[in-house]
Every structure is written in C-alpha cells, then in structure tokens.
UniProtKB/Swiss-Prot annotation:
The reaction(s) this protein catalyses: orotidine 5'-phosphate + diphosphate = orotate + 5-phospho-alpha-D-ribose 1-diphosphate
Residues annotated to bind 5-phospho-alpha-D-ribose 1-diphosphate: 96, 100, 102, 122-130
GO MF annotation terms: magnesium ion binding; orotate phosphoribosyltransferase activity
Amino acids binding orotate: 126
InterPro entries, A to Z: OPRT, Or_phspho_trans_dom, PRibTrfase_dom, PRTase-like
GO biological process, one term: pyrimidine nucleobase biosynthetic process
Protein name listed in UniProt: Orotate phosphoribosyltransferase
SUPFAM superfamilies in UniProt: PRTase-like (SSF53271)
EC numbers on record: 2.4.2.10
The UniProt record lists the keyword Transferase: yes
Function, in words: Catalyzes the transfer of a ribosyl phosphate group from 5-phosphoribose 1-diphosphate to orotate, leading to the formation of orotidine monophosphate (OMP).
EC class: transferase
Length: 209
C-alpha cells in the first residue's frame, strides 16, 4: 500500500477529517470548504504521529538529500518538526507568522546561520501563503530553503501557483484527491458527497457563494 493511501486512511480513522457540505468551514483565507482536515489531532495518536514523522524524514532524505536544519511553522508544524529533527539528528527551529512584539522580537526561534540548508515542515498546505511567509523569513535570515515537506495538501491551483512562482519545492505524504477516494471506498462519504467534494476542488474561491 502506498504512503499516500496509508496516511489518508490514518487521518480518516482518527477522525481528523470533517465533512460539512451544508455548513461549510471558512478558512483564514476566506475560502469556504465542505471539508476540513485537522492534522493537529494526530498528536493524540502515538502510532499515527510516529508513522508520519518517519515518512516525512524518509521523504526529506529522498527528495532533498542532506539538510542542515529542520524548521517547523508555528504552531501546527512545530511538533512534527521536532520529531522529524530527532529522527534525522538535526537542529530544529520554528518560525512564527510574524515577529514577536515583545522580548527579542524574534520571528525565528532557534539558531540559524547564513547558508544553512533548511527544510520547512508544515502540517497542511491550502493556499500556501503561511508556508511561504516562513520560507521568506528564513531566507531573509540567510538560510537556503530547499523546500517544504507537509503531511497533506488540498492541491489547490492557487497554492500550486504561489509555490511555483516562489520556486519552492513541495513534497507531501498525502493529498486531497487520495483522501476523498479512500473516504469513498471505505464508506466515510457517499457518492453525493463525492460530487460535492469534486465540485469544490474545481473552483474553491467561488464555491458556496
């Protein structure tokens, strides 16, 4: 069984995926969605989070080769970055969405040096905006960001475009298309739900308006 399918099954089993076609979720970007994937719930399931950490570590080695630092995005990417950095025996930092307004005013917590190769860990990619803010902060600090590794991506056109424009490589363990296919095959959703989910993916910005 592929990693994509295994992770999709695990997210469904631990009820990290919520479906509400008639009462859609509203994302921070303003997009309305019939589905919400809450990967923070993986923290409560040791076997699932261990599998995710191991799979992310393998993906990073296969895709990016040797890196110097693992960076987690605040807040959801932090625990996964910690477990992955342990497995790879690498230093870890985390990146806030913006600099603190008190103390040292840091946006990046943890030591980072000019020229270090950094991989960013995200729990989820939607439009990609928050991930790219972390990439930008790290590059401004002098790091060389080799790419982003995430658990899940919705695979939205806007997110793909932003990543391509920034020249940032993305690898993920699973994705929206795989998730809804597994959900249908294992009776988490109906055929009618599936049509709604496919329609949303075609035009998420205008869906439900």
């Amino acid at each position: 069984m592929s990693i994509e399918k295994q992770v999709a099954e695990q997210l469904l089993e631990i009820k990290a995926v919520f479906l509400k076609p008639n009462e859609p979720f509203t994302w921070a970007s303003g997009i309305k969605s019939p589905i919400y994937c809450d990967n923070r719930l993986t923290l409560g399931f040791p076997k699932v989070r261990q599998f995710i950490a191991k799979s992310l570590a393998e993906k990073i080695k296969q895709t990016f080769g040797e890196v110097d630092v693992v960076a987690g995005t605040a807040t959801a990417g932090i625990p996964h970055a910690a477990w992955v950095s342990d497995l790879l025996d690498l230093p870890m930092v985390y990146v806030r969405s913006k600099a603190k307004e008190h103390g040292k005013g840091n946006q990046i917590e943890g030591p980072i040096s000019k020229g270090q190769k950094v991989v960013v860990i995200e729990d989820l990619i939607s439009t990609g905006g928050s991930s790219l803010k972390a990439v930008e902060a790290l590059e401004e600090a002098g790091a060389e960001v080799v790419g982003i590794a995430a658990i899940f991506t919705y695979g939205l056109a806007k997110g793909k475009q932003l990543l391509e424009e920034s020249g940032t490589k993305l690898v993920t363990l699973t994705n929206y298309d795989e998730l809804i296919e597994v959900a249908l095959n294992e009776n988490y959703v109906t055929g009618e739900d599936m049509e709604t989910l496919k329609e949303w993916k075609k035009n998420p910005e205008n869906w439900g308006k």
